[in-house]
Structure formats: C-alpha cells, structure tokens
C-alpha cells in the first residue's frame, strides 16, 4: 500500500515495463513524439499547454525541441496530451525520456501515462509508469498497459508531472507501440521452490499464442531426465501447456527441465527452463507451502489471518492480541528480538518487512545507496531473525514496478539462499500482470481497495485474476480493504468523498477472497483505524474487524482441511440472475471435506440478492449454514442439488451431512 503513487482510480491499472522485447518493430502510434514539428506556431498533434508547461527549442535530448515543466504552485495540475489509436485485447508499450531538476513533492515525479474512456467519456482506466524526481539526467520512463478492455473507445497519452510537485522537468521522445509478448515467458512447477520428494508434480508453461504463432501449428514439448538418467521428451497441446509427472520418475538430485514451443516445421518459437530438484526427503523448514497451497508452520497447517501495521510496540500488541488475528505485517519491522519475543508470547506471528531495501527507490533507508548495500543489510537482517519462532514469512516487495523484475527475482533468490526455512510474500496492485511477476515470490497477494469508488465485488475480480496469473503454482494471501481512503486525503473536501467499508462489505470481501482461492488474509490496516477520518471511532471499526476476523478464525479447521483434495465437490452453479461477464460474476464458491462432512462456501459479492442452485458430486441428507445469515436456511432440492438464497454481499458456509449407507 505505501508505495502507491496515485489514488485508487489511478492505481487500478498501473503497470511497469515487462522487460521483454517485442518481436519485430511495431508501428509508432504517437505523432510528433519529439515535439519538433510546428505548424502555424503550434506543436503538431499536441494540445496547447497551460501555465507551467511550454514547448522550447534547444533543450531536448539532442539539442532539439522538448516539452518543459517549471512549477512553484503546489495546487497546479494540468498536462498536455494527444489521442492515440489502440485496439481492444492488445497491450501497448509506452515511454518518454525525462530530465529533472530539484523536482520535489509526494508524487511519483515526471512520468507518462495512457488513459482510456468509454464511448460516453466515462473514465475506465489507464496505465501509469513510475516517474523520476529529484535532479536526474535524461532517463527513459516506460511501461506496458494491460490488455485494453473491450469497452474502451478513446485513448490519450500524457507526459506529465503529478499534482503538488515543484521544480523543473523536461520531456522528449514520447512513444507508444503495440506490445507483442514473447511466445514463451517461463516454466513453473507446483512444487514449492521446485523441490519434491514424492507424489506428483505439474509443470506449467506461460505461453502467449498470438494469431501468427498459432498459424505455425505449434505444439509443446517438455524435456527432462528420468530416474535412470535417460533424457525424456513429453508432448503437450499448446492450448493446455502443462505436464503432470510422478516425482519418482524423475532423476534424483538437481536437473534443468526445459519446455519448448515448436512449430510444425520443427522451428523452436520459444523456450523456458527451470532447475528442479528431487530429494529423498523434504528438508526441515520452519514455514513453507505444501502441495495444497497451505502454509505449514512448525509442522502444522496455518491460515495467516492478520493486519498491516506501522510501528510495533507492546501496548499495541496487547490490544491487538485480544482480537482474533494470529499474525501482523508491520512496515516498520521489529529491530530487536525482544519485540519479536513479545509477539511470540502473545501468540502472534510476524511477516517481516524488507520491502524497502532497494537502492534508488522512494522508501529505501538512507544508508542503502547500492545493491551491495542491499545485500549487506538483508544478510544481516536474515541472520538476526531467521531462527526466531515468531517469524512467519519475509515481505519482499510492496508494489514495485516490473522495470525492477531482475532485481525482484534476484531478491527472492537471495532470500531463499539466506533463509530456506521461510517463504517470501509479495503484494501487488498489478493484478493482471501476476504471471510476469511469478519468479519474484513464493506467495502472492493483491490488494483490491474498492470502497467507495468501486463495488465490493472487485475483491472477487482481483482474486480470480491473481489466482489465474499464478498458473496454479503459487498460493495467495490476499489483502482486503479495512481502511477508509479518507485517511490518505489532505483536505476536508477530499476526505468527504470517501468512507470506510461497512461491516457487511468487509465481511463479503474477506470471504470473496477465500472463495476464490486465498489461503491467508492480511487486512489493510490496523494503524489506519486510529486515524479516525471523517469522525470515525477507532474502537467501532476495530470491533467490526474483530467480528469479521472471528467468524473466519472459527472456520480455519475447515479452510485448512485437505480431505476432499482433488475432488470436484461442486459440479455446477446456476444463478437466478443472468451474469454477463465471467470475470465479474457475483457468485463465488469453494468446497472442502472435514471429518466426512462437505462444506460449501458460496459468497454473493454483488449488490442484489441472489438465488444460487448447485449440483453436487455426492448425495446428502442435511444442509446447515454455519455462518450467521439473514436469508433463511439452505435447501436440499434433492440429494445432490443444493439451493442457497443470499442477501446482497452475503456469504454462506453450508455444512452437508452425507447420506448414511
């Protein structure tokens, strides 16, 4: 959250650079990107600039023309732009060269964005690159959009400086081109850290099948060494890029496994590999992820249920420990083992943050000037705390851009070498780019904060997209919104536009995340409750969080059960209300088996009541909702047909008792 550069509307679709060169040069979509063409005294294709911006000769990268910004008014916010022609379903890379001089303020600096609206002019989203501030020579700022949504009708590109920033900036060589990703982005496995001793492992390739690639009649092949050491090759359909093999059939020890995308004529169109290790027995670890995506902490399944913190002190820990939560993620991680000891004594685990230890980034400590400084700091920190029983995981990255992908990947790898006993958790708002971030984390979370600009259903949309992006290879600890955006606004007028989630919204968003695959929740945030914006009472908000958390905490034994693993407990779901978009369907379901009983979680993330009818795998004699409900009891319309009526935003966890045989 803390690295967010814009408000919610701007954040929803902000993405960084994918660091993958497009195959072949694509058509330039910006007209007069260097600002050099002038006609009738006006800069061709660009709108007229307002005060504090100007087009000037001789100040560009090569002594050519450039767009200049000079501002001493913290209230000024305007920027030039031009329309660009983008296509739905495509991604676009965009860039600008910027230079800054004493550019200061809370914003991200001099940057570039693309925004889109629908046919009626309603803002739908955009892509926003991380900017440059301070005093820096010419720097290329760039990013890649998400897939352009079908509803988007008009697009504009803007070189700009964020509101409230003072100083000087220069812009040159604006560019927008269609982004064509590489056919093969990576190869991943369902084994935690690509290490296994038994059972099966599935390998999944991240492929991008453009029409041009499909036209080549491509297929996939996986090459590995079997238990005898012989090389084996297994084929797969390019539309289903996965292979499941017995771990016992793999060569003992470490090997390089390769996936290739091969055209009909034998040409290799793309390839990726991973280092996989078969062992006789899994190593002892304090905290790790099992084959079911569950956290195993000191040998026992664990469902992280916590909140973000700012500073840890014993008084706050005493207060927090009275609630239902079992962990915390403090931005200001404990510097002493005494504080970690105190958390442990109170039954609380700590997700330890090292997310700021990247030189040159906004929140980097003053002493972190080089990557060598980073490694030294991280090494000392890990050595100090890796054996502490309160340590749950390391927090590696809070919304860093994809321009840092090599550094983020190297950080995860470093943490594994220094502490193989704990996973690395990353949280992103770039929820539709999770697949590209896969090498950078062991556990992923995304943080949909929709209230009050967007519906609570956003929690389902983001979690579904996040789960899809992991290729089923990494677990989710999601970050639901418990705070009021007003806590981050400055003026009373700005604060008045926002409110906190209601208890019903918070409850729904948490259960939506779980229903869509989350095996942990860390609410944002505990410390924001005490800012009390718009006259809120902290204890009232805290009580709401506790009630929601307590309801989830009571069901953790069910949520961690794997008795029904591999079974399709819910075969089909029908709703009374038609759903236009699969991505935004209001109903989410997930099921478990615990002590012979089946539990079906069904959540209505929408704003209208829903009747839900589910076809079940087995036959049952009794159905009971174990959560508090205002919509009556669930109904068995037949041994294998369950009907549940749900109020707006309502979850139900239905316990189904099997027919006795």
Which ranges hold each PLM region?
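Extracellular and organelle-lumenal recognition/adhesion modules and their flexible linkers in secreted
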Residues: 24-244
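N-terminal carbohydrate-binding accessory modules
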Residues: 267-321
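Catalytic domains of carbohydrate-active enzymes, especially glycoside hydrolases
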Residues: 307-342, 346-351, 444
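Active-site clefts of carbohydrate-active enzymes
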Residues: 358-362, 467-504, 528-531
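Active-site groove signature of glycoside hydrolases
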Residues: 377-407, 428-450, 520-522
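Aromatic/acidic polysaccharide-binding cleft in carbohydrate-active enzymes
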Residues: 492-550
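Carbohydrate-binding surface patches
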Residues: 577-620, 649
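C-terminal beta-strand-rich structural cap/linker in extracellular carbohydrate-active enzymes
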Residues: 637-661
């Amino acid at each position: 959250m803390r690295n967010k550069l814009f408000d919610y509307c701007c954040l929803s679709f902000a993405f960084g650079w994918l660091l993958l060169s497009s195959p072949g040069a694509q058509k330039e979509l910006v007209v007069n990107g260097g600002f050099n063409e002038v006609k009738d005294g006006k800069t061709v294709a660009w709108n007229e600039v307002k005060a504090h911006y100007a087009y000037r000769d001789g100040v560009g990268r090569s002594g050519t023309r450039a767009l200049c910004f000079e501002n001493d008014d913290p209230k000024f916010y305007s920027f030039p732009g031009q329309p660009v022609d983008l296509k739905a379903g495509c991604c676009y890379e965009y860039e600008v060269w910027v230079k800054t001089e004493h550019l200061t303020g809370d914003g991200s600096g001099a940057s570039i964005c693309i925004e889109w609206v629908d046919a009626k002019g309603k803002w739908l989203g955009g892509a926003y690159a991380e900017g440059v501030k301070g005093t820096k020579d010419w720097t290329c700022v760039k990013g890649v959009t998400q897939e352009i949504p079908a509803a988007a009708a008009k697009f504009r590109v803007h070189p700009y400086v964020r509101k409230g920033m003072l100083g000087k900036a220069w812009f040159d060589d604006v560019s927008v081109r269609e982004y064509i990703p590489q056919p093969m982005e990576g190869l991943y496995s369902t084994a935690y850290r690509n290490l296994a001793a038994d059972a099966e492992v599935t390998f999944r390739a991240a492929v991008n099948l453009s029409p041009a690639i499909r036209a080549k009649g491509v297929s996939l092949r996986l090459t590995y060494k079997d238990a005898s050491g012989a090389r084996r090759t297994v084929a797969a359909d390019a539309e289903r890029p996965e292979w499941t093999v017995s771990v016992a059939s793999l060569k003992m020890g470490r090997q390089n496994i390769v996936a290739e995308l091969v055209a009909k004529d034998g040409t290799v169109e793309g390839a990726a590999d991973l280092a996989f290790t078969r062992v006789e027995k899994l190593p002892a670890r304090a905290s790790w992820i099992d084959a079911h995506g569950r956290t195993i902490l000191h040998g026992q399944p664990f469902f992280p249920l916590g909140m973000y913190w700012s500073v840890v002190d014993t008084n706050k820990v005493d207060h927090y420990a009275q609630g239902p939560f079992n962990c915390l993620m403090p931005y200001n991680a404990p510097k002493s083992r005494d504080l970690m000891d105190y958390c442990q004594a109170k039954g609380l685990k700590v997700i330890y943050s090292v997310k700021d230890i990247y030189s040159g980034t906004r929140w980097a400590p003053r002493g972190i000037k080089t990557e060598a400084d980073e490694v030294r700091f991280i090494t000392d920190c890990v050595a100090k705390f890796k054996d502490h029983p309160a340590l749950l995981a390391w927090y590696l990255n809070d919304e860093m851009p994809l321009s840092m992908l090599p550094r983020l990947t190297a950080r995860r790898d470093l943490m594994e070498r220094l502490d193989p006993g704990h996973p690395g958790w990353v949280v992103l708002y770039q929820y539709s780019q999770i697949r590209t971030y896969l090498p950078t984390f062991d556990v992923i979370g995304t943080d949909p904060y929709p209230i009050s600009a967007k519906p609570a259903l956003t929690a389902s949309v983001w979690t579904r997209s996040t789960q899809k992006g992991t290729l089923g290879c990494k677990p989710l600890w999601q970050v639901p919104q418990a705070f009021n955006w007003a806590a981050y606004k400055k003026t009373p007028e700005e604060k008045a536009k926002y409110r906190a989630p209601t208890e019903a919204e918070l409850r729904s968003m948490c259960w939506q995340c779980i229903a869509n695959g989350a095996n942990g929740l860390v609410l944002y945030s505990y410390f924001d409750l005490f800012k009390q914006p718009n006259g809120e009472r902290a204890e009232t908000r805290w009580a709401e969080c506790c009630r929601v958390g307590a309801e989830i905490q009571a069901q953790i034994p069910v949520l961690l059960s794997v008795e029904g693993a591999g079974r399709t407990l819910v075969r089909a779901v029908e709703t009374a209300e038609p759903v236009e978009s699969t991505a935004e369907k209001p109903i989410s379901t997930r099921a478990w088996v615990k002590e012979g009983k089946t539990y079906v979680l069904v959540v209505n993330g929408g704003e209208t009541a829903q009747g839900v009818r589910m076809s079940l795998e087995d036959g049952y004699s009794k159905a009971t909702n174990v959560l508090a409900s205002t919509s009556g009891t669930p109904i068995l319309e037949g041994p294998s047909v369950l009907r549940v009526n749900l109020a707006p935003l309502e979850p139900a966890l239905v316990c189904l008792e099997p027919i006795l045989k």
